[in-house]
């Protein structure tokens, strides 16, 4: 029986078309999967980057708060604060020693806050990506650091007002103010600002360190 080469060619051509279409569909599926995997990898990589950014900002702010609370104020720091107060129009010469000291100490805390400004700006820069990737709880923990700084500055503002008060109630308030500014003196003392920083740092580490460290296990 003679072979119909024309029909055979049409047959194989049809098979080739089907196989070619199947290959295209398979390639499309593989390509789509590869793109999805690539996107997932990019998202995961971005999540790790943001986790590192948030933790770094938190560590910087925590260290900045510790720096602001340093109990030792060298003469140069006190003199610089006094000079700045005079430049701002506040004349401390002639004030009672207690009032003058209180104003200068207040100035020291504001100068320290200015010195560490970039560390707190790093926290503000991390808030938006933290909200996108990790939610409101992470943002609340981040905000604890600038809140602690602002609370300290509010307590510093009260130093001049409390410098000449001797009532028992005001003396108790003075103790609280100084704990706000310098931290606790004894382990059993209360330190609301310090505890808020510890709580925030613990929450961030519990949430984000596993994400950052996951790269070491890959």
Regions found by a protein language model. Give the residues of each.
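Terminal, low-complexity, charged helical segments
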Residues: 2-8, 60, 67, 136
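Short amphipathic alpha-helical/adjacent loop interface patches that line ligand
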Residues: 35, 58, 201
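An amphipathic alpha-helical interaction surface
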Residues: 89-218
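Amphipathic, membrane-active segments
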Residues: 39-80
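Membrane-embedded hydrophobic alpha-helical segments
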Residues: 1-41
């Amino acid at each position: 029986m003679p072979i119909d080469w024309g029909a055979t060619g049409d047959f194989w051509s049809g098979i080739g078309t089907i196989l070619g279409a199947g290959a295209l569909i398979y390639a499309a599926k593989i390509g789509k999967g590869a793109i999805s995997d690539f996107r997932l990898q990019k998202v995961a990589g971005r999540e790790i980057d943001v986790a590192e950014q948030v933790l770094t900002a938190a560590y910087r702010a925590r260290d900045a708060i510790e720096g602001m609370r340093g109990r030792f104020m060298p003469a140069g720091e006190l003199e610089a604060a006094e000079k700045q107060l005079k430049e701002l129009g506040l004349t401390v010469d002639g004030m009672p020693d207690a009032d003058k000291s209180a104003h200068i100490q207040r100035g020291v805390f504001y100068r320290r806050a200015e010195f560490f400004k970039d560390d707190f700006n790093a926290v503000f820069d991390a808030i938006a990506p933290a909200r996108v990737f990790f939610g409101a709880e992470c943002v609340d923990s981040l905000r604890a650091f600038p809140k602690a700084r602002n609370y300290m500055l509010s307590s510093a503002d009260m130093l001049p007002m409390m410098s000449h008060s001797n009532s028992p109630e005001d003396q108790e308030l003075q103790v609280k103010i100084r704990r706000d500014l310098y931290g606790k003196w004894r382990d059993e003392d209360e330190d609301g600002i310090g505890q808020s920083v510890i709580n925030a740092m613990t929450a961030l580490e519990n949430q984000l360190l596993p994400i950052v460290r996951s790269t070491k296990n890959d």
